[in-house]
Amino acid sequence: MPPIVAPRILRATSAISSYLSHLSLQCALRRAARLARAPAFPYSSMPISALSTRFAPRARVCLRAAAVVATCTALAFAPAAHARKKPHKDARRAPVVSAAARDAGLPASVLVALQRAKVPASAMSVVVERVGDPQPLIAWNANRPMLPASTMKLVTTFAGLSILGPEFRWRTTAYADGPVDPDGTLQGNLYIKGTGDPKLVPEELIDLVDKIRKAGIKRVAGGLVLDKSYFAASTRDLPSFDDDVSAPYNVGPDPLLYAFKAISFTVTPGEDGKVAVDVLPPLANLSIDNQLYEGSGSCASAAAAARPTLNADGAMLTASFAGDYPLRCGARTTNLAILDHTTFFARGFLALWQQDGGTIAGPVAEGKVPSAARPIAVHHGPVLGSVVYDINKFSNNVMARNLFLTIGAVAGKPPATPEQSSRVIRAFLQKNGIAMPDLVLDNGSGLSRDEHVSALSLAALLQAANASPVAQAFVDSLPIAGIDGTMKNRLTNAGVLGNAHIKTGTLRDVRAIAGYVAGADGQSYVVVSFINDDHAEAARAAHDTLLEWIYAGAH
């Protein structure tokens, strides 16, 4: 078994991140600019000796420049899942915990970190294995079902890549049910049918709008009808996970998810004494009441001034800003989840449609596309491999939830439900001999108090993923310690810097890590660890210490 950092599938790669790093185009452009200045290869921080060990001669990796259109990422991926090989025999063996692994206990450095955080060792579970060998080196509370937080995304993304294939694309289709006059007026309704594209952002939706115009339609005499039948109605506009209903991480899934149903307000003071407010994405019927002025107050008070007060008056929504905003505080962006999915998509679509004088005379409604309607435009979203990259690098909940439901819809039959998706994923795991008897799926993102899995089960999935045809797309999607994603600011001065692909997980009272470590000894390791405790937030050092210990040789 080759080490996980030596890709088993030879293809070109790109490490340029996308729109997902933030919820606005402006933030994404800043991230793209930063990455453009970074080393071309994500392992550039490794010593030359490590690179020669890991990438020669088997993994002759060729890098090519990635063209960035706006903030989208161009990636090449492994063969589709329908061409997958027989799973590695080790992936089919149910994990067996030896007495030595059970008795090994936690490393002393990890115990010290737990003690400092006031977290008992009983609140932590750990499994460490060599890649290709499911016999654990450490198995601490290995079989205990735990809250995994966002490490549950590993189950959803590996299943998605394997079942749908890395080249899978979502489709968003426009239909018309009437004739188009010579002057460009559609005598009927315009229908938009979604299939759950997790990354339908402004620069993607404008492609659909342009194609509708190219079909000869300038005006719509009827209404705008949104077909959301791909997901069951029970999956949409759900209660938020916690009390912060405006937090983007709380946005639920939707077949016509647009811009993550979140709006970005950026406040920027200028040398002329004025304070500008910019909004992304543009929404119809949204007005800005800007009463900000450039003063000499504190930047702490400026944070409050940068957060708008939202007021609805019929169809109009007004975002009001007021107060002192000093020049020295610089630009500040506030991301808010607002409106319901239908209203958000409709207003986003109308804003783009109206830019070149387009009109829709009738109301916005939900409904199925009639059988007599004809397709007039289709937008294909980014490939699944790119979406999985964003889901795992930046731990995007709503993208994971849309992928989770898509798995059920494609492998089963629409409308998708969480139960249907869970059955499809369980059947996939069973077919491929991946033993996860304690797995409990809810929404596939980890943003749940109902999802559970043991460290031993998740380690079995990581072993199988590394031995699969989608190994490279999967491993490439995981944050690299000290380099990018949710691990960018961790272990930046440690030996493990650049030598671990780790998915993180965070909830109140939960901290989790899961992924792969390339050890200094030339061995590659699988690691999974969960901490479920009231003081879990203070125990991040225990996980960082564990990763350093593994990198040093796991002994």
Where are these regions (language model features)?
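Conserved serine DD-peptidase/penicillin-binding transpeptidase domain
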Residues: 84-117, 163-436, 545, 552-555
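A short glycine/serine-rich beta->alpha loop
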Residues: 140-146, 335-336, 445-448
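N-terminal secretory signal peptides that target proteins for export/translocation
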Residues: 1-61
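Residue-level preference for non-acidic, small/hydrophobic
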Residues: 134, 153-160, 224, 256, ...
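Short active-site loop at a secondary-structure junction
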Residues: 139-159, 164
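A short, well-structured edge-of-sheet supersecondary motif
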Residues: 116-140, 365
